[in-house]
């Protein structure tokens, strides 16, 4: 069975994120991101180099996991977790990527700190089926 454009785009984005964030293979990652990559995130300098430089500045413990991915037209939306980022907490992110001819060309995101069970009013985890445990913070965060 032939893949749809949307399935192909999802597969490409997942491979791109794994290659850059988890494997840190910058040479291979260049083939996924356009040299004219447009970055809308308030956390990241402009362009592909801005993104790559951000990843280079984060500890090698960085890990990206995706729990949901949806594609519509040229857009791919991911719900994911960035852990090991050198901060006391993980980040939960929704990333929106626009694709052109199998290349990531534009990006938006919404990022927030991952809440512990003690912090969560809903008592439901923000990612996956369990809450994170932040040893240094669990006793101090209300």
Language model feature labels by segment:
Residues 1-142:
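C-terminal and inter-domain tail/linker signature
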């Amino acid at each position: 069975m032939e893949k749809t454009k949307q399935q192909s785009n999802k597969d490409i984005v997942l491979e791109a994120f794994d290659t850059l964030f988890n494997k840190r293979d910058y040479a291979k990652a260049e083939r996924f991101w356009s040299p004219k990559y447009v970055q809308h995130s308030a956390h990241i300098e402009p362009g592909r180099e801005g993104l790559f430089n951000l990843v280079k500045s984060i500890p090698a413990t960085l890990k990206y996991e995706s729990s949901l991915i949806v594609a519509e037209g040229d857009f791919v939306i991911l719900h994911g977790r960035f852990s090991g980022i050198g901060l006391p907490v993980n980040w939960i992110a929704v990333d929106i990527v626009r694709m052109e001819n199998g290349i990531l060309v534009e990006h938006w995101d919404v990022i927030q700190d991952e809440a512990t069970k003690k912090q969560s009013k809903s008592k439901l985890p923000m990612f996956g089926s369990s809450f994170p445990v932040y040893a240094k913070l669990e006793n101090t965060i209300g």
